[in-house]
């Protein structure tokens, strides 16, 4: 009788484990080498900031609450309930300042075994630390641009626990009227408001391209950062700049070994004597295409850029040798329902 009970118990545990794995797999959507991680996450507030303290590490625990992402703690009803209502600023239903922890399982496909894996967290507020299982993967604090983490060494195929600590404590000196953290424009919200995804790339790929126009020399300096090569490997980089109509201005090819790739590849490309400058009235753009080939596999990326020179004048900012006046509108509190800026293109089209 006892043996039968134990067998039944073990079968039940195996069944529940299988169901949990299936639910985890269903909660992530694989599309075009990317895993969409939006949806329900486990959650826990950490107002005292003990979650990174040895012996109290929250990334080692299974968090007890839940919250939807993308979103904020305000939207999830987390924090201190606020009954005050204001006429001169946004009125938050819930307020929270401090560390908040978000957690879920992810399933890495088998065909990602020999690829570079990145985590993209768009529009975080603010300091964001990522953990995979029991290892810290890094910390970033970008606001308007995505926080991107390289997780390749930590994500073998299979199931892993991904934990993210977002801390909206004001760690830098701020003016009391600043637009990034006060209710007069948005709020000091905590969360991740945009794209949350894992994506995979071939080992041979371009991580970053930067273009630096130099109007005085009629040239651009191009900085290309490929993913690291193995010792002894070499890659071939082809750079091509085109006018808007497609006419090729310059094309160059160069080889790089693992040490050069580690340092980053920089190359100056001439734009010719008839280079067209960019300003708000004649916003002429060029396109640069970078193709990186390693062992027969190629990653090609493009960027657009304008040739312009910005400098400080006596009383004005100067653009291409002329004094300019910058104009704009003060779009305060244009997202009152969320308290944070949208990452949806249609929302910005409506405003513009």
Q: Which role does the model predict for each range below?
A:
Residues 1-18, 25-352:
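Secreted/periplasmic carbohydrate-active enzymes, especially glycoside hydrolases
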């Amino acid at each position: 009788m006892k043996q039968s009970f134990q067998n039944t118990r073990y079968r039940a545990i195996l069944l529940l484990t299988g169901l949990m794995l299936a639910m985890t797999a269903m909660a992530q959507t694989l599309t075009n080498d990317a895993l969409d991680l939006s949806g329900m996450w486990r959650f826990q507030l950490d107002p005292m900031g003990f979650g990174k303290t040895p012996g109290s590490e929250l990334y080692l625990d299974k968090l007890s609450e839940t919250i939807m992402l993308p979103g904020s703690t305000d939207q999830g009803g987390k924090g201190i309930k606020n009954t005050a209502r204001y006429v001169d600023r946004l009125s938050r239903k819930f307020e929270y300042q401090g560390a908040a922890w978000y957690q879920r399982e992810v399933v890495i496909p088998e065909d990602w075994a020999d690829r570079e894996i990145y985590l993209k967290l768009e529009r975080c507020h603010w300091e964001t630390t990522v953990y995979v299982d029991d290892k810290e993967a890094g910390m970033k604090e970008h606001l308007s641009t995505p926080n991107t983490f390289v997780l390749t060494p930590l994500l073998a195929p299979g199931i892993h626990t991904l934990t993210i600590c977002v801390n909206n404590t004001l760690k830098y000196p701020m003016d009391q009227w600043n637009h990034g953290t006060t209710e007069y424009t948005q709020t000091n919200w905590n969360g991740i408001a945009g794209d949350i995804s894992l994506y995979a790339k071939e080992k041979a790929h371009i991580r970053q391209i930067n273009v630096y126009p130099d109007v005085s020399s009629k040239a651009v300096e191009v900085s290309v950062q490929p993913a690291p090569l193995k010792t002894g490997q070499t890659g071939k980089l082809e750079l091509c700049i085109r006018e808007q109509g497609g006419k090729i201005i310059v094309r160059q090819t160069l080889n790089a070994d693992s040490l050069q790739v580690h340092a980053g590849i920089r190359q100056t490309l001439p734009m010719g004597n008839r280079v067209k400058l960019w300003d708000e009235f004649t916003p002429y753009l060029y396109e640069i295409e970078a193709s990186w080939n390693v062992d027969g596999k190629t990653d090609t990326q493009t960027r657009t850029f304008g040739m312009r020179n910005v400098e400080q004048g006596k009383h004005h900012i100067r653009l291409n040798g002329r004094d300019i006046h910058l104009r704009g509108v003060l779009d305060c509190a244009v997202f009152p329902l969320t308290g944070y800026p949208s990452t949806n293109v249609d929302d910005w089209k409506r405003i513009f």
